[in-house]
């Protein structure tokens, strides 16, 4: 089994010639390699809808973790319920931070997402994912190379130094148009915020719509140097 500790530059490759551009093959490999010791960390963005549909074909009882920061859009929570109805066998876990919003405010002040967004993300996303991955050998992410400069070198199989794990990224070769084409073809549910200018959807406090021609992640932490929550730093 390929693990963080036994990592070596691997020659695992998947054909990009099929409809899924290697995604289905990557997922099949991942679940065969790690069996029950792998989890999909899903934010329920549109890429997530594609991955959930593919994962359901490979492993209908797969573990899926949603990092519930308690400040997501209502539309996101409603989408999760629709996904549960569409894929009832998937094991969707809504992972909570250890601190409630009130406890966080008492310790660090009100609106931490404004005063110190890195600390807020650490408390409400990074630490919960660390806990979720503690007993796993690998995790799945919906990163695409097209999304941003920080993601353009992502591989199918990655050594993840942040969480000392293996990160599997099946959608690296997909374009934004291909994601939507797949969603429409298979009549998948998706967050209606995508229809009103939100290409990337995170917490309600830190996500704004993006103007025409903008980068897909321009609406995340707008006005701040921060462009990533920290889950995908190497």
From Swiss-Prot:
Q: What is its EC number?
A: 1.8.4.10
In terms of CDD domains, this protein maps to: PAPS_reductase
Q: Where on this chain does [4Fe-4S] cluster bind?
A: 120-121, 203, 206
Pathway info: Sulfur metabolism; hydrogen sulfide biosynthesis; sulfite from sulfate
- Which cofactors are reported in the record for this sequence? [4Fe-4S] cluster
Report the coiled-coil segments: none
User: So which domain of life are we looking at?
Assistant: Bacteria
What residues form the catalytic site here? Answer: 229
- Key word DNA repair present: no
From the Swiss-Prot or TrEMBL record, what is one GO molecular function term? metal ion binding
Which keywords are on file for this protein? Cytoplasm, Iron, Iron-sulfur, Metal-binding, Oxidoreductase
Q: What does the UniProt entry say about where the protein is found?
A: Cytoplasm
List all disulphide bridges recorded for this chain: none
Which reaction(s) does the protein catalyse, per the Swiss-Prot or TrEMBL entry?
[thioredoxin]-disulfide + sulfite + AMP + 2 H(+) = adenosine 5'-phosphosulfate + [thioredoxin]-dithiol
Q: Which GO terms describe its cellular component?
A: cytoplasm
* Cofactor binding, per record: Binds 1 [4Fe-4S] cluster per subunit.
Q: What class of enzyme is it?
A: oxidoreductase
- Which Gene Ontology terms describe the biological processes this protein takes part in? cysteine biosynthetic process; hydrogen sulfide biosynthetic process; sulfate assimilation, phosphoadenylyl sulfate reduction by phosphoadenylyl-sulfate reductase (thioredoxin)
| Family, similarity comment | Belongs to the PAPS reductase family. CysH subfamily.
Function, in words: Catalyzes the formation of sulfite from adenosine 5'-phosphosulfate (APS) using thioredoxin as an electron donor.
- What is the name attached to this protein's record? Adenosine 5'-phosphosulfate reductase
High-level lineage: Bacteria, Bacillati, Bacillota, Bacilli, Bacillales
């Amino acid at each position: 089994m390929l693990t963080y500790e036994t990592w070596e530059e691997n020659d695992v490759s998947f054909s990009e010639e099929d409809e899924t551009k290697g995604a289905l093959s990557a997922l099949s490999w991942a679940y065969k390699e790690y069996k029950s010791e792998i989890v999909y960390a899903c934010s329920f963005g549109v890429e997530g809808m594609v991955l959930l549909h593919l994962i359901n074909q490979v492993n209908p009882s797969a573990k899926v973790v949603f990092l519930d920061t308690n400040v997501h859009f209502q539309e996101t929570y409603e989408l999760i319920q629709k996904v549960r109805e569409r894929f009832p066998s998937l094991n969707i876990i809504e992972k909570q931070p250890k601190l409630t919003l009130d406890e966080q405010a008492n310790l660090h002040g009100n609106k931490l997402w404004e005063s110190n967004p890195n600390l807020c993300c650490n408390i409400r996303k990074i630490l919960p994912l660390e806990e979720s991955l503690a007993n796993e050998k690998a995790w799945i992410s919906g990163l695409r190379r097209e999304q941003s400069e920080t993601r353009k070198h992502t591989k199918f199989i990655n050594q993840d130094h942040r969480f000392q794990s293996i990160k599997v990224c099946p959608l690296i070769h997909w374009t934004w148009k291909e994601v939507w084409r797949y969603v429409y073809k298979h009549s998948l549910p998706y967050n209606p915020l995508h229809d009103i200018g939100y290409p990337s959807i995170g917490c309600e406090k830190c996500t704004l719509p993006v103007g025409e021609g903008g980068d897909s992640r321009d609406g995340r932490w707008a006005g701040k140097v921060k462009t990533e929550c920290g889950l995908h730093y190497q």
